[in-house]
């Protein structure tokens, strides 16, 4: 049962990500931004190769960061001058493994819910605490209320969206209830 539930949650991420990216490309084409749409197709095809070509659940952090970089470039094309992104993860950590597509939904949340009137700064940091890999995504965007976070994370909600709830479930299924998003 545990493996079937994990497979179900992992399978949800790819369609969510694909639909959002195709919507972004469509948006650029509607705005007659053909060159930017072409660049998005380039990054999108690279992402598809990285995320769909390997049928493994865990990947090295380095691959996850490379995939995330492509995603960030896609969003920079769609939302120019709305956010900056920095990644502070020691090269020595790149071989640590984690469930694939764990970081992209978190950064996506920062972009789509953090952008307001001002340019935001999204920062990914990674380090080891003992033998635990800690990855922190921070932004200085408009923020989200505790009630909204609780609503998104509520297990009783129907799974009609993926994203943070999906990431939380996959972390807990893989590592136990003491781990997850905070």
Whereabouts are the PLM-identified features?
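Two-component histidine phosphotransfer core
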Residues: 1-182
């Amino acid at each position: 049962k545990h493996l079937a539930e994990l497979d179900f949650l992992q399978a949800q991420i790819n369609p969510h990500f694909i639909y959002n990216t195709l919507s972004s490309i469509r948006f650029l084409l509607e705005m007659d931004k053909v060159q930017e749409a072409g660049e998005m197709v380039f990054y999108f095809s690279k992402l598809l190769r990285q995320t769909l070509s390997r049928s493994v659940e865990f990947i090295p952090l380095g691959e996850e960061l490379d995939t995330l970089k492509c995603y960030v470039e896609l969003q920079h094309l769609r939302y120019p001058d709305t956010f900056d992104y920095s990644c502070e993860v020691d090269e020595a950590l790149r071989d640590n493994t984690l469930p694939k597509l764990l970081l992209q939904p978190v950064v996506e949340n920062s972009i789509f819910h953090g952008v307001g009137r001002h340019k935001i700064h999204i920062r990914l940091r990674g380090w080891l605490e003992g033998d635990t890999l800690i990855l922190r995504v921070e932004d200085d965007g408009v923020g989200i209320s505790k009630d909204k976070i609780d609503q998104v994370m509520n297990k009783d909600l129907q799974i009609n969206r993926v994203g943070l709830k999906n990431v939380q479930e996959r972390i807990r299924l893989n590592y136990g209830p003491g781990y997850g998003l905070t």
